[in-house]
Amino acid sequence: MVKMLVLYYSAYGHMEQMAKAAAEGAREGGAEVTLKRVPELVPEEVAKASHYKIDQEAPIATPGELADYDAIIIGTATRYGMMASQMKNFLDQTGGLWAKGALINKVGSVMVSTATQYGGAELALISTQWQMQHHGMIIVPLSYAYREQMGNDVVRGGAPYGMTTTADGDGSRQPSAQELDGARFQGRRVAEITAKLHG
């Protein structure tokens, strides 16, 4: 059975919801899934004053454990068109894994949330994939296999590179049913492709 980690950073709970949906989809695809988050770097008083969602139930991951999984889906909030510093800080601690080639041929996939529809989602998806490529991971994107990302009738999440959601600048918009469905699709797709590669 494929062992998968869904690893996320979420300040306001949007990516937490997307990560849970991706984990559901991966389980539907036959994977054994672990859901974890990266540590918060913002001081607690600042996080509280900014109304961060600090009661997230997912346990904190450690960089060394990434080698224990066949596939890793990273979900991250974005800052100015890049992954949030919390996720970057975590990934910057994986140099030891890189030196040993511990993640070579593992499967990787990415999801992001942005404040606006054009808030750098595709750049953040691709630049996060770069981190995985430096580790020799095999990237499995959302792709246009997920057709529900098409259309302009409503705000839709998704890009060929990975699933996206839009939170609005004040965080008031929650992931839509379509975006959660896309996260489930991506999780299931990654599980099924990983099973073919590592089964």
Swiss-Prot record:
Binding site for substrate: 98
The protein's Enzyme Commission number: 1.6.5.2
Substrates-to-products reaction catalysed: a quinone + NADH + H(+) = a quinol + NAD(+); a quinone + NADPH + H(+) = a quinol + NADP(+)
Annotated TM spans: none
Leading EC class: oxidoreductase
GO cellular component, as recorded: membrane
Necessary cofactors: FMN
Residues forming coiled coils: none
Residue span of region Disordered: 161-181
Gene Ontology MF: a single term: flavin adenine dinucleotide binding
PROSITE patterns the record matches: FLAVODOXIN_LIKE (PS50902)
Matching HAMAP family: NQOR
Identification of the protein by name: NAD(P)H dehydrogenase (quinone)
Gene source species: Brucella canis (strain ATCC 23365 / NCTC 10854 / RM-666)
